[in-house]
UniProtKB/Swiss-Prot annotation:
<dbReference type="GO" id="GO:0050566">
    <property type="term" value="F:asparaginyl-tRNA synthase (glutamine-hydrolyzing) activity"/>
</dbReference>
<keyword id="KW-0547">Nucleotide-binding</keyword>
<comment type="function">
    <text>Allows the formation of correctly charged Asn-tRNA(Asn) or Gln-tRNA(Gln) through the transamidation of misacylated Asp-tRNA(Asn) or Glu-tRNA(Gln) in organisms which lack either or both of asparaginyl-tRNA or glutaminyl-tRNA synthetases. The reaction takes place in the presence of glutamine and ATP through an activated phospho-Asp-tRNA(Asn) or phospho-Glu-tRNA(Gln).</text>
</comment>
<comment type="similarity">
    <text>Belongs to the GatB/GatE family. GatB subfamily.</text>
</comment>
<dbReference type="GO" id="GO:0006412">
    <property type="term" value="P:translation"/>
</dbReference>
<dbReference type="InterPro" id="IPR014746">
    <property type="entry name" value="Gln_synth/guanido_kin_cat_dom"/>
</dbReference>
<comment type="subunit">
    <text>Heterotrimer of A, B and C subunits.</text>
</comment>
<dbReference type="InterPro" id="IPR017959">
    <property type="entry name" value="Asn/Gln-tRNA_amidoTrfase_suB/E"/>
</dbReference>
<dbReference type="GO" id="GO:0070681">
    <property type="term" value="P:glutaminyl-tRNAGln biosynthesis via transamidation"/>
</dbReference>
<dbReference type="InterPro" id="IPR003789">
    <property type="entry name" value="Asn/Gln_tRNA_amidoTrase-B-like"/>
</dbReference>
<protein>
    <recommendedName>
        <fullName>Aspartyl/glutamyl-tRNA(Asn/Gln) amidotransferase subunit B</fullName>
        <ecNumber>6.3.5.-</ecNumber>
    </recommendedName>
</protein>
<dbReference type="InterPro" id="IPR042114">
    <property type="entry name" value="GatB_C_1"/>
</dbReference>
<keyword id="KW-0436">Ligase</keyword>
<keyword id="KW-0067">ATP-binding</keyword>
<dbReference type="GO" id="GO:0050567">
    <property type="term" value="F:glutaminyl-tRNA synthase (glutamine-hydrolyzing) activity"/>
</dbReference>
<dbReference type="Pfam" id="PF02934">
    <property type="entry name" value="GatB_N"/>
</dbReference>
<dbReference type="InterPro" id="IPR023168">
    <property type="entry name" value="GatB_Yqey_C_2"/>
</dbReference>
């Protein structure tokens, strides 16, 4: 990156739209379900029929309150709905019902790890609103699918407290993990259950000025988010450098962009609207939403262990490396799998490495999640225990892991019974003979080792393991090799 760019910093905030996994929509009894035939999950309310009146979904409120408790925000005892007016084909009423002035949650924070450092990203608010429909384009015309119209959302608005793409991705990743843990959304980003609008401005380092921001709409990939933020950061810096004497407000006007992943650039959609352009006013067909402290406390007590708390526990209780703990807690199903396996295997570090490296790699190739692969946590625990007990070598364990992926119902013990030829080499006289052959075949390595080049020992061990097809116990190979070399 140019040194000129290094003199600037980004100021980033995120608005995240999260579809709540209720059975019905926010203000009607129409089904809330993705993937059905277009315009089958609709009602007079979500299609804006005259005379239809909204009725608030109680479960959506409960899920919004649960989120507020999870982020340690202030859940409002009194909140209110407003109309946000805009005209677009996917909005049949020509307004959205949202919470403009009195949101259900204010404040709170998302805990994340950025480059090994604990960070608390502050939230401004979270409010309840309904989603719009979807435009589907077919060549020269477009159709409107209102199945999504009226689906309950919470919009989570952060403060402008992030200063680089890594901050934003860490925040977004931690937020999705939190949503998954508390179970208020299916968090399927490919289906649009979580959509990120990213706001970014730039300023010279050391400045406290907040310049005009640009919004990049509907990011549904962490990788695209990082790319878009870096591209937009460079675009804005270039614009300011090209116009050093101009008023910053005229150099970068407030606008909405989208990310073009093929061209690797942000593309202008429209100039930014002002709040007054939406003509907000109180929703006349819904009463004030009134909650009680007892109701909020009841919901707070249903919170599970949250990902960041679990992360800290894994560091202390299991003594895991920070990066391994972060991988395990990122998905609640993977964390649960690890904890079940850890009940039967006390070599937690080896167990976690097998889960996050060996089995994770195999599952990725097959497009599976280990937690749903059919492999039992006890089977993975048994595999690691067998290595520690010297029943099998690491090479044999990898072969068994391959077989477990193909036959997930089989434990390592069962696989070894069915394939006794996989058992490690136990005939020490045969092993000593192989060691002698390797020593004879590699005289230079022997000379190197005896002259103090310790890497030569590793080479000799590798040759022995190759000759035994990985079936010789590595520790015993080392011991016997040293004995033979000392002769």
């Amino acid at each position: 990156m140019s040194d000129v760019y290094a003199d600037w910093e980004s100021v980033i905030g995120l608005e995240v739209h999260v579809e709540l996994n209720t059975k019905s929509k926010l203000f009607s009894c129409a089904r809330n379900r993705f993937g059905d035939e277009p315009n089958t999950n609709i009602s007079p309310v979500c299609t804006g029929m005259p005379g239809s009146l909204p009725v608030l979904n109680k479960e959506a409120v409960r899920k919004a309150v649960l989120f507020g408790c999870a982020v340690e925000g202030e859940v409002a005892l009194l909140s209110r709905f407003d109309r946000k007016s805009y005209f677009y084909p996917d909005s049949p009423r020509n307004f959205q019902i949202t919470q403009f002035e009195h949101p259900i949650v204010r404040g709170g924070h998302i805990k994340a790890i950025v480059h090994g450092e604990e960070r608390h990203f502050e939230l401004a608010q979270a409010h309840i609103e309904d989603d719009a429909g979807m435009l589907k384009h077919f060549g020269e015309f477009a159709g409107v699918d209102y199945n999504r119209a009226g689906v309950p959302l919470i919009e989570i608005v952060s403060k402008p407290c992030m200063f680089c793409a890594d901050d934003a991705v860490a925040y977004a990743t931690a937020l999705v993990s939190l949503l998954d843990y508390i179970g208020i959304s299916d968090c399927n980003m490919e289906e649009g259950s979580v959509r990120f609008d990213v706001n970014i401005s730039v300023r010279p380092k050391g400045s406290e000025e907040l310049r005009n921001k640009v919004e990049i709409k509907n990011m549904n990939s962490f990788a695209f988010m990082a790319q878009a933020l870096e591209a937009e950061r460079c675009r804005q810096i270039d614009a300011y450098l090209d116009n050093p004497n101009a008023d910053p407000k005229t150099v970068i006007p407030g606008a909405t962009y989208r990310w073009d992943p093929e061209k690797k650039k942000t593309v202008l959609m429209r100039l930014k609207e002002r709040a007054e352009d939406y003509k907000y006013f109180i929703e006349p067909d819904l009463p004030v939403l009134q909650l009680t402290e007892a109701y909020i406390d009841e919901i707070r007590h249903t919170l599970p262990e949250l990902p960041f708390n679990k992360y800290q526990r894994y560091l202390h209780e299991y003594a895991l490396a920070e990066d391994i703990a972060a991988i395990l807690i990122s998905d609640k199903h993977s964390a649960h799998f690890f904890e079940l396996a850890a009940q039967e295997c006390k070599n937690y570090r080896a167990l976690s490495n097998w889960l996050t490296v060996e089995f994770a790699g195999r599952c990725k190739l097959k497009g599976k999640n280990l937690a749903f692969s059919g492999i039992l946590p006890s089977s993975v625990a048994q595999l690691v225990n067998f290595i520690d007990q010297g029943v099998i070598t690491g090479k044999i364990a990898k072969d068994i892991a391959d077989m477990m992926m193909e036959s997930p119902e089989k434990s390592p013990e069962t696989i070894l019974k069915e394939n006794p030829e996989m058992l490690p080499m136990t005939d020490e006289s045969a092993l000593v003979a192989i060691i002698s052959e390797v020593i004879t075949a590699n005289p230079q390595s022997v000379v190197d080792y005896k002259s103090g080049k310790t890497k030569a020992l590793g080479f000799l061990v590798g040759q022995i393991m190759k000759r035994t097809q990985g079936k010789a116990p590595p520790n015993r190979v080392n011991e016997l090799l040293l004995v033979e070399l000392s002769k």
